Amino acid sequence: MMANDAKPDVKTVQVLRDTANRLRIHSIRATCASGSGQLTSCCSAAEVVSVLFFHTMKYKQTDPEHPDNDRFILSRGHAAPILYAAWVEVGDISESDLLNLRKLHSDLERHPTPRLPFVDVATGSLGQGLGTACGMAYTGKYLDKASYRVFCLMGDGESSEGSVWEAFAFASHYNLDNLVAVFDVNRLGQSGPAPLEHGADIYQNCCEAFGWNTYLVDGHDVEALCQAFWQASQVKNKPTAIVAKTFKGRGIPNIEDAENWHGKPVPKERADAIVKLIESQIQTNENLIPKSPVEDSPQISITDIKMTSPPAYKVGDKIATQKTYGLALAKLGRANERVIVLSGDTMNSTFSEIFRKEHPERFIECIIAEQNMVSVALGCATRGRTIAFAGAFAAFFTRAFDQLRMGAISQANINLIGSHCGVSTGEDGVSQMALEDLAMFRSIPNCTVFYPSDAISTEHAIYLAANTKGMCFIRTSQPETAVIYTPQENFEIGQAKVVRHGVNDKVTVIGAGVTLHEALEAADHLSQQGISVRVIDPFTIKPLDAATIISSAKATGGRVITVEDHYREGGIGEAVCAAVSREPDILVHQLAVSGVPQRGKTSELLDMFGISTRHIIAAVTLTLMK
């Protein structure tokens, strides 16, 4: 950077001040037009946004999604009007469009989403922006090895979220010197003062304790902000935090630093007078042109990834699907150099260590911080820069559900791998057993849910997920199970496999993972009694192959049994019931885990909770008696 970036001339300083006031005016008009909106939060951040967008950040005005642009994340998404106002000043949004804030069919929503080309991730659920910023910064520093920088504007109130400090620890550990977090310390939260109010020095101490380079500035002093952002650009091997002391509602008489104005526009009868007051402080009509970025990001391709060779397993081989996951990822990493894997300190249990051993430069250890791991994955995947797989015990994704939910709103392309599913986890104990994960991921919009049952189908699930738009979840299991498919078998999303069938099938049994193998064993026992059953492997639980299930049910007298290593609520059985709900004369009998499990051997627990071979045989017998 040039010296005048650190100390801009008098004219530039005045234009930045004037721009900040125009941002306030845009925010006032937009919130008045909508009748609601966090105007006061916009006003406290006006100088920060002015300096970032028109002095510090480098980006192409006409191409907001360019890979070399600096990134900006508004973690405090409720201040969206100030972001939209900035893009009015840039020239990408018209002033008339800004007046459609929060209206139906307008992309200018209450909180920003990637429906807008200048928004990388959806925000509004507080405490998540910095984690995604970490993912962007990590990608820029270690994968793209490019010049772009990442700026995250946060509110002081959201610093109460633990995920913020997970992100702080991550950024410090990985020396993300291309990352700048700005705390807008405006003293007030939604319903009252923030816990530390204007204790900016305490925020500074917290940031420094996490190993961040930190500056404490007057957030309404554009010269001080320019200086701080320039200094941040000179620091090596440390992320920077700028603690900006501001006032909520800055510039608005009787509202500045006053409580009970969060989420409220100024009264319409006062709006014109307030706008005129702010306009009277504007001395120029000039605009500053953003600097162009350094174009040094590599050209990449993350589409149409092919298997380099068929799966190397034979029918009858025994291997756990969660181990196959690690082997398949390492193989996928050879097919495309933009495949990355994130772990929450479980690589030796989930077998992602196999990928790490082969591709160490593309493995990201996120330690025991699952919320941040998901946020980092979201950030890494923005602008199509990586194919991200994040793995953990599936049970621990529950604590990151809000991040997953926001990832869906962000239209994120990330892949989550959940291991140690169900009571088949066995002696590792109940706290490690995922029994709610299918319900959780099935509820996420546009999320594809894979449940492979052997090594062949697991490898296919990995490749399909890598090529699938949107979020994907792959459920893997700990017990070793037999390979039942040949290497030549083809798999598709939404297409089930009928793995056992005959002309005289009496009942359709649907199982996945370990319970598919229990179902096949039950079918063998029943055939010795002269009872033929059809066995289906759904492969994907969402979308579910309703056509195959319905046709099989009709072929077996409308008799269907589902068996799953999951709670009844939200699992395979309920998915099947929904699929056949409009079909007359189809009866679904569900076998699922009920109650809180306990530690034990896999076979003991499958039997104790009614999902073993013995219970499937009993269910078939009972169904045929009705």
Swiss-Prot record:
One of its GO terms (cellular component) is cytoplasm. InterPro entries: THDP-binding, Transketo_C/PFOR_II, Transketolase-like, Transketolase-like_Pyr-bd, Transketolase_C, Transketolase_N. Thiamine diphosphate binds at residues 41, 78, 124-126, 157, 186, 248, 262, 370, 396, 432. Keywords: Calcium, Magnesium, Metal-binding, Thiamine pyrophosphate, Transferase. The active site is at 370 (proton donor). It catalyses: D-sedoheptulose 7-phosphate + D-glyceraldehyde 3-phosphate = aldehydo-D-ribose 5-phosphate + D-xylulose 5-phosphate. The record marks 262 as: Important for catalytic activity. Overexpressed in hepatoma cancer cells. Its EC number is 2.2.1.1. The keyword Calcium applies. Pfam families: Transket_pyr, Transketolase_C, Transketolase_N. This is Transketolase-like protein 2.
